[in-house]
């Protein structure tokens, strides 16, 4: 777990560091994990890379392998952004599906300041009336570990038809019989988190669905309707939010280069190839050598 990153923990002879769910770690945390030992090999895994990670693969700092095939028999999850005006119709459609359902809310309890953002506790009470013929369960992070496990066990066993929950189900939940994911306040989540939540369904041969409710659906959220690949979503996120600071710790934001553009995807491989060709010849190219030896920040950022 994250305990590996403790400064008091001394580890020697670490040759390989594997980071799963990479998007859940910060830049400093990932650097601390990979610093254990003498420059260990690092393998990071994620279904939805953050913009900075995509940029690092583009700039050649990370080698990339893509797993593009779905498990046999699986179907892509159909995703719809649902306007508030269609909420009642969406509920009626859900009632007819005869399947298990996740309903994810951003908050556990109602907020005094963000009154329009739905909470799991209040939605549980409302939905129990709307879906009066269904059995509902409630899951959130404030429950005791034993109680959380009991709720998940009952949902997996089919004792609950609908699980009202917070994003606590984002990882580690595998319930193939659940085929509908409803996400309230989709604008409150990042693309990576939305894609991870969507991945809780579509785990059987049955068609699965993801319904995204948002008061102001953005292009970022609408992209989920047509894009099923986590990597393609991450590329969209890179274009929309920027790559952050390659030399620093910011994981998004548009870098302010003098000339180059971070999203010149087709040009970057050619630049890499040219840099690799010229680097061994620096002693023969004194002007270029002087540039390379200068502080890179002064070269790439405008005054």
Feature locations, PLM:
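C-terminal accessory region of SF2 helicases/translocases
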Residues: 205-206, 217-303
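Inter-lobe coupling/hinge segments of SF2-like helicase ATPases
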Residues: 1-222, 281-282, 287, 303
């Amino acid at each position: 777990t994250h305990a590996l990153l403790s400064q008091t923990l001394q580890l020697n002879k670490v040759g390989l560091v594997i980071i799963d769910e990479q998007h859940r770690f910060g830049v400093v945390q990932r650097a601390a994990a990979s610093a254990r030992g003498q420059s260990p090999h690092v393998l990071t895994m994620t279904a939805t890379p953050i913009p900075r990670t995509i940029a690092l693969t583009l700039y050649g700092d990370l080698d990339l392998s893509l797993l593009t095939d779905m498990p046999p028999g699986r179907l892509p999850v159909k995703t719809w952004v649902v306007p508030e005006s269609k909420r009642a119709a969406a509920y009626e459609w859900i009632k007819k599906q005869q399947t298990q359902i996740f309903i994810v809310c951003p908050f556990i309890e109602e907020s005094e300041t963000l009154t329009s953002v739905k909470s799991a506790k209040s939605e549980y009470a409302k939905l129990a009336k709307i879906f009066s013929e269904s059995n509902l369960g409630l899951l959130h992070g404030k429950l005791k570990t034993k109680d959380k496990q009991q709720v998940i066990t009952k949902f997996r066993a089919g004792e609950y038809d609908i699980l009202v929950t917070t994003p606590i189900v984002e990882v580690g939940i595998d319930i193939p019989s659940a085929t509908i994911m409803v996400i309230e306040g989709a604008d409150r989540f990042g693309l990576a988190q939305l894609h991870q939540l969507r991945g809780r369904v579509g785990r059987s041969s049955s068609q699965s669905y993801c319904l995204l409710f948002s008061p102001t659906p953005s292009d970022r959220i609408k992209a989920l309707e047509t894009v099923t690949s986590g990597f393609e979503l991450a590329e969209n996120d890179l274009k929309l939010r920027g790559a952050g600071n390659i030399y620093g710790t910011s994981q998004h934001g548009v870098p302010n280069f003098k000339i180059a553009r971070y999203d010149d995807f087709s040009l970057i491989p050619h630049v890499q190839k040219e840099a690799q060709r010229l680097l061994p010849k620096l002693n023969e190219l004194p002007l270029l050598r002087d540039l390379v030896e200068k502080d890179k920040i002064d070269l790439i950022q405008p005054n």
